[in-house]
Regions:
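Phosphate/nucleotide-binding beta-alpha loop and adjacent structural elements of enzyme active sites
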Residues: 1-172
């Protein structure tokens, strides 16, 4: 399915929440996922954003359209891709996760606004064990610096994802 969380849900019995603003991708999730699904983009605060919806072709490249949206040229150059820009209202981590305080795993792949969402999480309130984030610019240390401040260590890079673990739970 291309999902970091799918394995844990399907084979380990984990439950969670998936944020998917793309209408096309959300409909696919509804067919094969049991976790809570939210058909909105997640961001650091609730606001209206421009969303780049890829309807055909590179549909996995949809994302919030801002200065950090790195996929635009790739999508526009792909002759099989059809896309449109639409307005969507974002939701926040806190609005959807506030009842949980201990979280085994979070996977964040939101096409360039990962750090915005990470900055909005209260790491003193939520005890998160492992976080993976998509990082299309591995030469930048933004994530490593952020997680170091939160007492997380870098574990590994798998494809475009960097995995960090909380020192409170693991001692390697």
């Amino acid at each position: 399915s291309g999902s970091n969380c799918f394995h844990f849900e399907k084979f380990q019995g984990w439950n969670g929440i998936a944020f998917e603003p793309s209408k096309i991708q959300f409909e696919k999730l509804e067919k094969n996922r049991k976790c809570k699904l939210v058909n909105k983009p997640i961001n650091e605060k609730q606001k209206e954003v421009d969303f780049f919806e890829v309807e055909e072709g590179l549909t996995q490249m949809s994302g919030i359209y801002d200065d950090n949206f790195i996929s635009e040229q790739l999508i526009k150059n792909d002759k099989n891709s059809k896309f449109k820009k639409i307005k969507l209202l974002t939701t926040t981590f806190e609005e959807n996760i506030s009842h949980e305080t201990e979280i085994d795993y979070i996977s964040i792949d939101i096409e360039g606004v990962e750090l915005n969402v990470l900055h909005s999480i209260d790491f003193n309130k939520y005890l998160i064990k492992v976080i993976s984030v998509e990082n299309n610019s591995p030469d930048k240390n933004d994530f490593k610096l952020f997680f170091n401040e939160k007492n997380f260590n870098f574990f590994d890079r798998v494809g475009q994802d960097e995995i960090f673990y909380n020192n409170k739970y693991f001692n390697f």
